[in-house]
């Protein structure tokens, strides 16, 4: 592994203190001095094809943003290092950096593929395709009435319901918004898609887990009130009444570098189910 790049969220490290420390440890442990540094907000359209590894310094939001904006030709794995708040998606905490780099040198790690979604939507009479790592959510505006949804799976009607919204999630996203809305945890290495309603008023829609190659078509009706499409909780697009949103598996997956002692269930316990200061030191 010769070419390492670092994508950093500058709002998490104003004075480059963490960045400089990371670069120094890479230099000393990996014997690599030529390290490219990128602003995580400016990743789109950059040619990163020469990289063997991209380190993402930030929190979950930083990693989500980078994953969506990476060019489809990008093939290197990502090592997420949490310097944010929660860090569910990150491979390690910043405090574990030195040990992680030593494991990297001994190849005590494995690349895991994380499924992504493709959302096709008509925006201003132009079809747009948008990637998502966590989820695609369709929901009413703040002061809007409930939305009527029609959901089709592979051209077959699954449900018609009224509610605040719905979430189409990847397994990676099952610990995020989907979980908050009552959806199940799904092991992130699986290739399935879940649909979870948000405040289903009619109780005619239940969460469902579908095979990964399913095509989901959503028709959202709100009598002219606001409807928003939100991607990974970061990009919001106002939709027209009777908008059609099509969601399916993206042909490209995210390659996430995880170490062999990575414990998904420990992450769930410590960072999702017991996300509090008292549990930060739990080691079991």
From Swiss-Prot:
InterPro entries: ATP-NAD_kinase_N, ATP-NAD_kinase_PpnK-typ_C, NAD/diacylglycerol_kinase_sf, NADK. Pfam families: NAD_kinase, NAD_kinase_C. The keyword Nucleus does not apply. GO terms for molecular function: ATP binding; metal ion binding; NAD binding; NAD+ kinase activity. The active site is at residue 60. It catalyses: NAD(+) + ATP = ADP + NADP(+) + H(+). NAD(+) binds at residues 60-61, 134-135, 145, 162, 164, 175-180, 234. It is found in: Cytoplasm. Its EC number is 2.7.1.23. One of its GO terms (biological process) is NADP biosynthetic process. Its cofactor is a divalent metal cation. It is an enzyme of class 2 (transferase). Keywords: ATP-binding, Cytoplasm, Kinase, NAD, NADP, Nucleotide-binding, Transferase. Coiled coil: none annotated. One of its GO terms (cellular component) is cytoplasm. The keyword ATP-binding applies. Signal peptide: none annotated. Belongs to the NAD kinase family. Involved in the regulation of the intracellular balance of NAD and NADP, and is a key enzyme in the biosynthesis of NADP. Catalyzes specifically the phosphorylation on 2'-hydroxyl of the adenosine moiety of NAD to yield NADP. This is NAD kinase. It comes from Clostridium botulinum (strain Eklund 17B / Type B). The gene is nadK.
